[in-house]
A protein has these predicted regions:
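Short beta-strand segments in beta-sandwich/barrel cores
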Residues: 26, 35, 53-58, 75, ...
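Phosphate-/nucleic-acid-contacting segments
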Residues: 143-187
Length: 187
């Protein structure tokens, strides 16, 4: 996905503001298995994903519990770092070889102060993430595992080809056996 499209999907910026943001955002590549962020460490980076797939997870009872997937067009960063200048609680691992656009969190904050359009872009992004978090919370609290699976497939149509079933079942909060039953039921 092109960086212009990624930026505009969040909030359309005037060309001068977009160029100011792009001047600070080089393209980087990392291999499958690379961790963009590690739990309990403060990070100085903010990423926009051009190509690839990743998951965010925490450890609970020595098991990885996935709570979010990222794909092309998504912004990736620990909320605690970006908004509270604290270490994040999550690990974010690439599930495929990936191409990203990398931006320093300090530089992003400087751009927020220097350009009202970029500040509004950041605000719109934060609003969008709050809505996503609320939807995820409601899904986890009130939807069945079948409904959560259907939502996941609607949001990530190619996820079964890109993500191991163990990670998908972790995200859904079910066993791989239960995931297999759900998949068999809706085929």
């Amino acid at each position: 996905m092109d960086i212009y499209d990624i930026i505009d999907n969040i909030y359309k910026l005037p060309l001068a503001s977009k160029e100011a943001l792009l001047n600070e955002t080089p393209e980087v590549t990392y291999p499958k298995g690379f961790h963009l962020f590690l739990a309990n460490r403060k990070s100085s980076k903010f990423y926009l994903m051009k190509k690839g797939m990743l998951h965010a997870y925490i450890y609970k009872s020595d098991k990885k519990v996935t709570f979010w997937f990222g794909k092309e067009g998504d912004a990736i960063f620990p909320l605690q770092t970006l908004y509270n200048n604290q270490a994040g609680y999550e690990n974010i691992e690439l599930l495929e070889d990936s191409v990203l656009y990398e931006l320093s969190v300090d530089k992003l904050h400087d751009l927020y102060l220097a350009d009202i359009h970029i500040a509004n872009w950041g605000r719109k992004f934060a609003e969008r993430e709050c809505i996503k978090s609320e939807q995820l919370f409601i899904s986890r609290q009130f939807k069945t595992s079948l409904e959560r699976y259907q939502d996941l497939i609607a949001d990530y149509p190619d996820i079964l080809q890109r993500v191991p079933l163990g990670i998908i079942s972790s995200y859904l909060g079910i066993s791989q056996v239960s995931l297999s039953r759900i998949r068999a039921k809706i085929r």
